[in-house]
Curated annotation (Swiss-Prot):
This is Protein transport protein SSS1. The keyword Repeat does not apply. InterPro entries: Prot_translocase_SecE_dom_sf, Translocase_Sec61-g, Translocase_SecE/Sec61-g. One of its GO terms (cellular component) is endoplasmic reticulum. Part of the Sec61 complex, which is the major component of channel-forming translocon complex that mediates protein translocation across the endoplasmic reticulum (ER). The functional states of the translocon complex include co- and post-translational ER import, cotranslational membrane protein integration and retrograde transport of misfolded proteins out of the ER. In the cotranslational pathway, ribosomes synthesizing presecretory proteins are targeted to the translocon by the cytosolic signal recognition particle (SRP) and its ER-localized receptor. Belongs to the SecE/SEC61-gamma family. GO terms for biological process: post-translational protein targeting to membrane, translocation; SRP-dependent cotranslational protein targeting to membrane; SRP-dependent cotranslational protein targeting to membrane, translocation. It comes from Saccharomyces cerevisiae (strain ATCC 204508 / S288c) (Baker's yeast). The chain crosses the membrane at residues 47-75. PROSITE patterns: SECE_SEC61G. Its main location: endoplasmic reticulum.
Length: 80
């Protein structure tokens, strides 16, 4: 009798593990669909602000990279 109850508990534990494995992707999909439902496209004003910010960032990174290159060219020739 004790053996039958042990097998029943093992089966319950394995069912719980399977439920936990299945629950994670289902929860992920549910939360993802809720997030996408809340999202909206930016209006023209917001879009232009984003484009300006990204453009300024590209220009700033380019200027910094160019300045670093200008500094390292003479240093490279002094070392070599």
């Amino acid at each position: 009798m004790a053996r039958a109850s042990e097998k029943g508990e093992e089966k319950k534990q394995s069912n719980n593990q399977v439920e936990k494995l299945v629950e994670a992707p289902v929860e992920f999909v549910r939360e993802g669909t809720q997030f996408l439902a809340k999202c909206k496209k930016p209006d023209l004003k917001e879009y232009t602000k984003i484009v300006k910010a990204v453009g300024i960032g590209f220009i700033a990174v380019g200027i910094i990279g160019y300045a670093i290159k200008l500094i390292h060219i003479p240093i490279r020739y002094v070392i070599v």
